């Protein structure tokens, strides 16, 4: 019996290589927005519904992470309560404005909104309302997928059309693009794993820019390294907001 592991690795690495070749300037542009916000007293907010919330969590309160990141994580848009709940709710109007108000997002801030398809009401509305506030918007999405589907928002537009910067995760239409041999089954979704890579790359570039400009960014250490708790508690108390 043959294994699919090597073929899947090749499939995944093709997408990762494409992202490496095409997304550097978007990462740099996004990092400039975030670093400027930080130096001017702003914050970096991150939001994703469904599985995309994992990317928001990846850079929130994380070892090596910027303490000025705030993840917007409404439990009703995650998967731990009922799997289909977020699917239904992210198509409803009016939620995004409440989330932004609850987290006190301002015109000093940058928000990254993550949606693989970029078509559903909540992420599109989140981008519109963020822009209305005056915050800068970074979209993380799949351009291959988003450009192949219609919007579910009343504007007829998708997330990337309201963004100042677009990070393209390179995922194929439908996300799960690896075909199981001798079948019509597609699996191996990549949007979250590549998305986490892009999110970490954005943080790394942001920290690079801040240090270059003489700004000492507050960065967490791993809580599982001896002696880190006291350091992290100080950082947390001074900078973390939720």
Curated annotation (Swiss-Prot):
Top-rank lineage group of the source organism: Bacteria
BP-aspect Gene Ontology terms: carbohydrate derivative metabolic process
InterPro entries hit by this protein: RpiR-like_SIS (IPR035472), SIS_dom (IPR001347), SIS_dom_sf (IPR046348), SIS_GmhA/DiaA_subfam (IPR050099), UPF0309 (IPR022951)
Residue span(s) of domain SIS: 34-217
A molecular function (GO) term: carbohydrate derivative binding
Pfam families: SIS_2
Family statement drawn from the similarity comment of this UniProt entry: Belongs to the UPF0309 family.
Record protein name field: UPF0309 protein BH3325
Species this protein is from: Halalkalibacterium halodurans (strain ATCC BAA-125 / DSM 18197 / FERM 7344 / JCM 9153 / C-125)
């Amino acid at each position: 019996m043959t294994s699919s592991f090597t073929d899947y690795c090749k499939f995944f690495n093709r997408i990762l290589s494409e992202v490496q070749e095409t997304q550097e300037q978007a990462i740099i542009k996004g990092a400039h927005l975030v670093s400027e916000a930080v130096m001017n007293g702003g914050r970096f907010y991150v939001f994703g519904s469904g599985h995309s919330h994992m990317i928001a969590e990846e850079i929130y309160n994380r070892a090596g992470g910027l303490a000025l990141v705030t993840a917007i994580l409404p439990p009703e848009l995650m998967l731990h309560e009922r799997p289909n709940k977020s699917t239904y709710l992210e198509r409803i109007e009016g939620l995004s404005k409440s989330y932004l108000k609850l987290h006190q997002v301002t015109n000093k801030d940058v928000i990254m909104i993550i949606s693989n398809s970029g078509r559903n009401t909540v992420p599109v509305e989140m981008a519109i309302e963020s822009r209305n506030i005056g915050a800068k918007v970074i979209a993380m999405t799949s351009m291959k997928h988003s450009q192949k589907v219609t919007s579910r928002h009343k504007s007829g537009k998708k997330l990337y059309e309201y963004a100042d910067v677009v990070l393209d995760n390179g995922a194929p239409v439908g996300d799960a693009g690896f075909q199981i041999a001798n079948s019509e089954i597609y699996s191996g979704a990549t949007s979250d794993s590549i998305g986490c890579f892009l999110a970490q790359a954005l943080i790394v570039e942001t920290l690079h820019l801040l240090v270059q400009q003489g700004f000492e960014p507050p960065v967490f250490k791993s809580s599982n390294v001896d002696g880190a708790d006291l350091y992290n508690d100080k950082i947390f108390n001074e900078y973390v907001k939720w």
